[in-house]
Amino acid sequence: MKNFYPIKSKKELEMFIKTDRIACFGSDKISFEKKLRNPFKTNLFNFLKLLRKYEYLCFKRDSSKNAIKSKLTSFQIKLIDIKKNNLSLKLDIEINPFHCGKGVRICHPNVIINGYTGDNCIFHGNNVIGNKKTGAKTDIPKIGNNVDIGTGAIIIGDIVIADNCVIGAGAVVTKSFTTPGTVIAGVPAKEISGEK
């Protein structure tokens, strides 16, 4: 499966980073004091910034026709990957590159995202978004924009979650919900309400 490159220019990189900063801190301008008072958010934003740079540099390397520039970019990617992975361990968060839309908001640690998520998704913590036991890269969830995923919610398998859905705390989602604005809860998850 080929990589999907969401960030193809420096301008797009800056836009992704700005949107992630606003999602983390509620503002594009962050004071030094605010960073000190919120170490989790500060480290999370630094992780997301490294993730976005990694995604951009992968596109730059793979689209380069110059072998020397490509090798230099590969070296940059390795350095960023090491920093990103160290922060990932510190935060207890795992997000696969090229899988997460801009403006992601993670409220608490223990989040694994191995599925495609749209823009402005909220993860409240202790969430797993992943594939079934087959391990195939195609058996992963596709989550729309503006989806709010409650604490402890798990989304597994080759399923689709529509835009603007809310997934309740502790829900185990193993089937698709394609109606936008659906409230989903339970084990196994079922529709509680939808947009009217």
Which residue ranges define each predicted feature?
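Residues at secondary-structure transition points
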Residues: L44, K137-T138
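Terminal amphipathic alpha-helical/low-complexity segments used for targeting or macromolecular assembly
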Residues: M1-L89
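Left-handed beta-helix
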Residues: L91, N96-P97, G101-G103, C107-H108, ...
